């Protein structure tokens, strides 16, 4: 039985007429699934699973603006309003949330990892709704554990921050997840292949740039690089990164986008990546056939304006799944 796992009430989404998909919205089509049902068997075809990670404990520890714990609900609300374009043969299941106000960050990450692994075992493609960016470490652990021990998992992070901070004194938080991945991969005598898109120099100290420079397999583009290059050149960088990789995990930190597009985040930005460009890059990653899971994190509803940020997150899911649904395992 999964710990810290809660199903949604069946009345959460508006139900619709199934045979009228031309007029349907996501909220009318999404189905429910109980991951603790012992009778579940792997599903056939292309199927997605939404799972919320209701925690911003890592943001609190990292001295950020708390509120991302409410992110999953806000993203779901916006996603439910979007038109359904995935046809009859693609299914989206909402399996509920990982939640535990009185549980430690590490316990919740472990619970998320087990849930994500369970989704993979059921042939469901995981889409995790954060939550702070501590979501990423739990998601990564789950995806990695679903692979064979010798298989490596590349990571692409759309983010204004490296999130490679040391954690020996502070403990894990929303800014340490990728350092934890790095250390764990090193301990397994593997290489941590990590590409960050959208780095803002004014948000990262020289210690982090030095750490990246000394590493073997960490690459990045700054937000200004991306602005100058355009999406086609950015996609070439992605292609080069993925050329010798078999699996990739994508994590989207909404604070990569400027406040005009994403005001409701844990760490607000004055500069940021163009969301339209980001959509094209996300779709390109999905089209590679190597994507095995993604998440959208750091949506903080208490700081949002007219649900702009939650709607942006939902839009990314909408456009990314359009391409990912065309990739058959």
UniProtKB/Swiss-Prot annotation:
EC number: 3.5.3.8
Reactions accelerated catalytically: N-formimidoyl-L-glutamate + H2O = formamide + L-glutamate
Cofactor: Mn(2+)
Pfam families: Arginase
Manner of cofactor binding, per the entry note: Binds 2 manganese ions per subunit.
Main function: Catalyzes the conversion of N-formimidoyl-L-glutamate to L-glutamate and formamide.
Protein name: Formimidoylglutamase
Lineage: Bacteria, Bacillati, Bacillota, Bacilli, Lactobacillales
Gene name, Swiss-Prot/TrEMBL: hutG
